[in-house]
């Protein structure tokens, strides 16, 4: 039953994304996709998908059919207390990624601030090896009222178009209630 529910939800989401892709194009070759939590601009013709993991996260993702790079918009469920700051979010993200890529040479090659949703967020560029390939990931972290959001783009090093990530981050906005 759970599998059927997940499949139906996936089909519904793809329909929503496909419908969203028919909206007017923002910049040349891009479309703004809006959801219940956030909106961002994505490249046209990238393959959509989503993950909805019960009480953990909601993610929409788009895969470049040419390079295999993946662009993700993520909402992590569960509001954090007011004492939880952006620095805590960044520290937790790095620790989680270190664990995820353990034994693969995962490292933060660059970190700093980035403008996201009209406010300051944190930026991470990380690298690791996977199956003999050099991989990279660009991550923008955003914390608003205890809610955690990420824009992530990852793929094989040298095949990830950072301009796509930059446009998604620049256009990222919380959904209007």
What are the residue ranges of the model-derived segments?
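Soluble non-cytosolic domains of exported or imported proteins
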Residues: 37, 84-91, 159-166
